[in-house]
Amino acid sequence: MNNTREEVGEFTQIFNALMSLMRKFIFKVLRVGPIPTNISFIMDGNRRFAKKRNLEGLDAGHRAGFISVKYILQYCKEIGVPYVTLYAFGMDNFKRGPEEVKCVMDLMLEKVELTIDQAVSGNMNGVRIIFAGDLNSLNERFRAATKKLMELTEENRDLIVVVCVAYSTSVEIVHAVRDSCVRKSKTGDGSSALELSDIEECMYTSVVPVPDLVVRTGGGDRLSNFMTWQTSRALLHRTEALWPELGLWHLVWAILKFQRMQDYLQKKKKLH
């Protein structure tokens, strides 16, 4: 019995080593072409995944989704993508049943606090976490946890991850316009008109470059009120794969599509 376990363990180690080598080769080939500066993910399909797999519990699909987050971030880091934006919880999601909302938010808090422990132990592998959205609408414990995690990881630079929580473009624009007006009034420049740059500087996501590739899982064609201002020149890639099903090859295919469309995307940028 012990020999069997040892053999399984050795096989697992060999398999993982081979997979790591394969990824390194694939990513080296990918890096011959342009790599997106910021990939944004609209993580759709957790509930459908749970239903498809007959998983029990309101948070079952979302727990599976968190596993995908871990792997996708690792792949992006290995490829050399400097920024990743995750649409974790939109303002419209608060319209779901109160029991489900509480379940998802509790799970998210659990993962944030677990990541805090990792950051304290120095196990973040150079990943910086930034939370963006109407964080004031969240409970005090959640806000405190997000603030602490951002502080603990603010010096990390290998991969910068923006997690959009309590987020919608509509709310973001209202917030940005209001803050822009307040800034101008405080500087005594309230008489001048607002410039586009004034508003963009006050956006929740202004700390990172705008996305140049948006990946939506679950077969949807909509942006669902996610960064519609910032993604006007981005490539939208949709996949039928549900978020917990998203894997290495889905990501590689999305980046290859981005590379094939590069001439078109550059022409669009020059028009703005």
UniProtKB/Swiss-Prot annotation:
- Pathway involvement? Protein modification; protein glycosylation
CDD domains xrefs: Cis_IPPS
Ranges in coiled-coil conformation: none
Can you cite an annotated GO cellular component? cytoplasm
Q: Tell me, what is one Gene Ontology molecular-function annotation carried by this entry?
A: transferase activity, transferring alkyl or aryl (other than methyl) groups
Q: Does the keyword S-adenosyl-L-methionine apply?
A: no
Q: What is its EC number?
A: 2.5.1.-
- At the top level, the lineage of the source is Eukaryota
Kindly list the cofactors needed: Mg(2+)
SUPFAM superfamilies assigned: Undecaprenyl diphosphate synthase
- Enzymatic class: transferase
Record Gene3D superfamilies: Decaprenyl diphosphate synthase-like
What this protein is reported to do is described as: Catalyzes cis-prenyl chain elongation to produce the polyprenyl backbone of dolichol, a glycosyl carrier-lipid required for the biosynthesis of several classes of glycoprotein.
UniProt name for this protein: Dehydrodolichyl diphosphate synthase 8
Taxonomically, what lineage is the organism?
A: Eukaryota, Viridiplantae, Streptophyta, Embryophyta, Tracheophyta
